[in-house]
């Protein structure tokens, strides 16, 4: 029940002061005035508090349990980060203040970008983008600006592997590029021969995730970088899966020219349900002149925003980006240290391989062998044998108090499930998840209707996805 349906005429949660208030009628012309009052819900304060408390209790988050969404890195978010982000020295400042009066905030941003440059092997970094896809668009605008600065106007094509995130081709298209798909080999890696066949003087960039969305490391990345650069194009790194390689190898060492990161994923700021996020973009030195303004610099013991980049693509976000997300990532990096970040990646890979080994006993893994931080289940044979879809399995997982993995992505595997356990889960949790999944597989064979009609214990049961898509209801009519 939505809060509007709980409304009782005349019930109030407030009382206006007795003194006469100045009427504002003269401010608005007649055609802008309402002819009848808004249909706002009328409830008492306890009604409102109980309504939203009940909704909060129905929510699921990583603080409640296992959240193995593949390609999302739903790791635990340390509460130390939240404490620091709540300090009034950070929450009570304003971006319009003179920069001399916010030296602490500027220091945080400067040191964070230096940390991120060190982690990625880049030379300069902007912290402006508000999310991963926003970072992609920023990066692709830099690619365009670079080629135009060389009067290389023929380069209008962005190459994107078929295993890429869906936002990669979308971001490239938004930046004005024509997108061409590169097929993967049977092993799930970039097809070098096909890549070579596509490389010509019209190619602007190859967008790549490494490890890729199958959880596989592109072992030929050095060759790929060489071929792309020989063709005069740039190599773009989607940092969605950086959690697998921190402290082990840097994208800059692989040959990437541009990197975008997801601080809300890899560096532990809470995310999901639309944000807030942060998608910094790092570049090699020869691309730094195109970064958005301002760049945070240091002069002696003073920090300042530098707007003097004549070839900049301009602002891509108001002010300095999502500052409190930047702050949480900064605290995370400081508390973990270099060795801690390396250990986090090691444990992320270990957990993924342990869980993969358990699940491989009763479900097919799309790419046999060692994976990185995540892996993909190929459920096509399972569906043929049982008539139960992977979507049904995901719905049934909810009945066991767990969040479902990502389903039907990447698109190159049919009836698939992408599982990323992250480094913050213990062996007991992984064992329990594997047992739940095995039990559901048995249910699909013996009592398939139980799985097909799941979930059964959640506040909201099986939704009518088709009607919701074709006839969405976006708002409640207030008048």
From Swiss-Prot:
Membrane-crossing residue ranges in chain numbering: none
User: Where is the PTM N6-(pyridoxal phosphate)lysine found along the chain?
Assistant: 265
Please give a single GO biological process term from the UniProt record.
glycine decarboxylation via glycine cleavage system
**Pfam families registered for this protein in UniProt:** GcvP2_C, GDC-P
Offer an example of a GO molecular function term for this protein: glycine binding
Tell me the domain of life.
Answer: Bacteria
Q: Which Gene3D superfamilies match?
A: 6.20.440.10, Aspartate Aminotransferase, domain 1, Type I PLP-dependent aspartate aminotransferase-like (Major domain)
Sorted keywords for this record are: Oxidoreductase, Pyridoxal phosphate
EC assignment: the record states 1.4.4.2
Q: Which InterPro entries match?
A: GcvPB, GDC-P_C, GDC-P_N, GDC_P, PyrdxlP-dep_Trfase, PyrdxlP-dep_Trfase_major, PyrdxlP-dep_Trfase_small
Tell me a GO cellular component: glycine cleavage complex
Which co-factor is required? Answer: pyridoxal 5'-phosphate
Q: Which reaction does it catalyse?
A: N(6)-[(R)-lipoyl]-L-lysyl-[glycine-cleavage complex H protein] + glycine + H(+) = N(6)-[(R)-S(8)-aminomethyldihydrolipoyl]-L-lysyl-[glycine-cleavage complex H protein] + CO2
Question: What binding partners and quaternary form does the record give?
Answer: The glycine cleavage system is composed of four proteins: P, T, L and H. In this organism, the P 'protein' is a heterodimer of two subunits.
Show the HAMAP family listed in the entry. Answer: GcvPB (MF_00713)
Which family does the record claim for this protein? Belongs to the GcvP family. C-terminal subunit subfamily.
Main function: The glycine cleavage system catalyzes the degradation of glycine. The P protein binds the alpha-amino group of glycine through its pyridoxal phosphate cofactor; CO(2) is released and the remaining methylamine moiety is then transferred to the lipoamide cofactor of the H protein.
According to UniProt, the name of this protein is Probable glycine dehydrogenase (decarboxylating) subunit 2
The organism is: Pseudothermotoga lettingae (strain ATCC BAA-301 / DSM 14385 / NBRC 107922 / TMO)
